């Protein structure tokens, strides 16, 4: 049986940590940044951990 291919659309959006968590970039950092406080922009810059159910699906897509 051939190897499973990685879904490249999923690979572009998430990354796996060494401990197996699935990290993703949050929304809200594309435009209208001048109206957001510096504190808010710093908070939005960080990557977030996906919830358990979504992380399980994404790991399946990553192969």
Swiss-Prot record:
Residues 26-50 are annotated as: Disordered. Pfam families: Ribosomal_L35p. Transmembrane segments: none annotated. Keywords: Ribonucleoprotein, Ribosomal protein. The keyword Membrane does not apply. GO terms for biological process: translation. GO terms for molecular function: structural constituent of ribosome. InterPro entries: Ribosomal_bL35 (IPR001706), Ribosomal_bL35-like (IPR021137), Ribosomal_bL35_CS (IPR018265), Ribosomal_bL35_sf (IPR037229). The keyword Ribonucleoprotein applies. SUPFAM superfamilies: L35p-like. GO terms for cellular component: ribonucleoprotein complex; ribosome. Coiled coil: none annotated. Belongs to the bacterial ribosomal protein bL35 family. This is Large ribosomal subunit protein bL35. It comes from Bifidobacterium animalis subsp. lactis (strain AD011). The gene is rpmI.
């Amino acid at each position: 049986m051939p190897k499973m291919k990685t879904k490249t659309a999923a690979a572009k959006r998430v990354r796996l940590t060494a401990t197996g968590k699935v990290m993703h970039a949050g929304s809200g950092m594309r435009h209208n940044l001048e109206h957001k406080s510096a504190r808010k922009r710093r908070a939005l810059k960080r990557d977030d951990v996906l919830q358990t159910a979504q992380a399980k699906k994404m790991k399946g897509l990553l192969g």
